[in-house]
């Protein structure tokens, strides 16, 4: 049976549970709930862990318990424990440089200033791993300085209006993840990258 490893990035704890920076957590929590699976803390994996079987695949879901800036420690622990290749993992992460509702699948790339991705790249010593980036939009600028308040934006709570958009994004990403073992890679990439919230 094919095994699929999904790693959602975020910060543990109630304080961050509904923040934009926790979209990776939120998406995998939605996926796990769909299959009536629950997350349990696995110290050896430095993550909360959930698994289920679907479409002739075993899905292994991980929510690092290391806080965002040390996500690489959890990813390294997962790779070491399961003895898997990098191409078997899919990292799900928020992206402030993408408009809200946009999705981008990339097989490699820089951190783009995202501390979670930066930590993974530093620990693994490579940029070559699958990542699904979900847009949260840019933070608003202040009139006084015209600078972006990035920290307060990414750590801020998702609004009701944003949630209505992100719920549709989650559906598209989850559908795509469910098809990883039944559709060609090009199909999955196009399904994610072509998503347009205006056409839903």
Swiss-Prot record:
Subunit structure, as described in the record: Monomer.
Main location group: cytoplasm
Active-site residues per Swiss-Prot or TrEMBL entry: 21
Any one Pfam family match given in the protein's UniProt record, by short name: Pept_tRNA_hydro
Annotated site residues (Stabilizes the basic form of H active site to accept a proton) in this chain: 94
GO BP terms: protein quality control for misfolded or incompletely synthesized proteins; rescue of stalled ribosome
Catalysed reactions, as listed in the record: an N-acyl-L-alpha-aminoacyl-tRNA + H2O = an N-acyl-L-amino acid + a tRNA + H(+)
Enzyme Commission number: 3.1.1.29
MF term (GO), any: peptidyl-tRNA hydrolase activity
Keyword terms of this UniProt record: Cytoplasm, Hydrolase, RNA-binding, tRNA-binding
Protein source organism: Prochlorococcus marinus (strain MIT 9312)
KW Lipoprotein (keyword) present: no
Protein name: Peptidyl-tRNA hydrolase
Cystine pairings recorded for this chain: none
Origin superkingdom: Bacteria
Similarity comment: Belongs to the PTH family.
Cited function: Hydrolyzes ribosome-free peptidyl-tRNAs (with 1 or more amino acids incorporated), which drop off the ribosome during protein synthesis, or as a result of ribosome stalling.
Residue sites binding tRNA per the record: 16, 67, 69, 115
HAMAP family reported in the protein's UniProt record: Pept_tRNA_hydro_bact (MF_00083)
Record carries keyword Hydrolase: yes
Classification via CDD domains: PTH
Subcellular location: Cytoplasm
GO CC, any one term: cytoplasm
Record site feature (Discriminates between blocked and unblocked aminoacyl-tRNA), residues: 11
């Amino acid at each position: 049976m094919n095994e699929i490893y999904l790693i959602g990035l975020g910060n543990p704890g109630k304080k961050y549970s509904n923040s934009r920076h926790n979209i990776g957590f939120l998406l995998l929590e939605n996926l796990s709930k769909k299959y009536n699976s629950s997350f349990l803390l696995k110290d050896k994996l430095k993550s909360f862990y959930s698994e289920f079987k679907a479409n002739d695949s075993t899905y292994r879901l991980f929510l690092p318990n290391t806080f965002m800036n040390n996500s690489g420690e959890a990813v390294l622990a997962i790779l070491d424990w399961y003895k898997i290749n990098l191409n078997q993992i899919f990292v799900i992460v928020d992206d402030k440089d993408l408009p809200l509702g946009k999705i981008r699948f990339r097989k490699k790339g820089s951190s783009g200033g995202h501390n979670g991705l930066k930590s993974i790249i530093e620990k693994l010593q490579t940029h070559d791993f699958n990542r699904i980036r979900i847009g949260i939009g840019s933070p608003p600028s202040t009139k006084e300085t015209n600078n972006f308040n990035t920290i307060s934006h990414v750590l801020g709570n998702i609004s009701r209006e944003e949630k209505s958009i992100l719920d549709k994004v989650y559906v598209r990403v989850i559908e795509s993840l469910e098809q990883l073992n039944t559709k060609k890679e090009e199909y999955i990439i196009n399904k994610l990258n072509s998503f347009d919230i205006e056409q839903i």
